[in-house]
Regions:
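HIT superfamily nucleotide-processing domains
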Residues: 1-127
Length: 127
């Protein structure tokens, strides 16, 4: 949580902006304690999580005109269940390779405020 900023809360998940200005990168964190894998959620929450991933993915595509979305559930370093949704373009700094190969670049205060405002506005539109 230190390297991310709260955007909004959905029914199941908290949505946070990862503090890496190289990529539009958000993280969905289901508000369920001690969940590590999607299979740890009950079936109702599994379905809700998939719906939230699809909802957020569509908004990310629209807001950032992506070439490709990377949707990843890794959790090797932070075991708490969380999903990364990263908007990629063919012009980004690590295309077509993984975002993990380039060093992150923190948002400036001004660009962070703009990014959070853009995401909040986009994610609140269709709810």
């Amino acid at each position: 949580l230190k390297s991310s900023h709260h955007i909004i809360d959905l029914k199941l998940s908290t949505i946070r902006l990862h503090d890496n200005s190289r990529f539009p990168w958000i993280i969905l964190i289901p508000k369920r304690n001690k969940m590590i894998d999607i299979s740890d959620l009950n079936s109702r929450d599994q379905i809700l999580l998939i719906k939230e991933i699809v909802y957020v993915s569509k908004i990310m595509k629209k807001l950032f005109k992506t070439s490709k979305l990377n949707v990843e559930k890794i959790g090797n370093i932070v075991p708490q269940l969380h999903i990364h949704i990263i908007a990629r373009t063919i012009k980004d700094s690590s295309w077509p390779l993984s975002v993990w190969i380039v060093k992150g670049k923190k948002y400036s205060k001004q660009s962070l405020m703009r990014a959070l405002e853009k995401l909040r506005k986009g994610l609140n539109k269709k709810r």
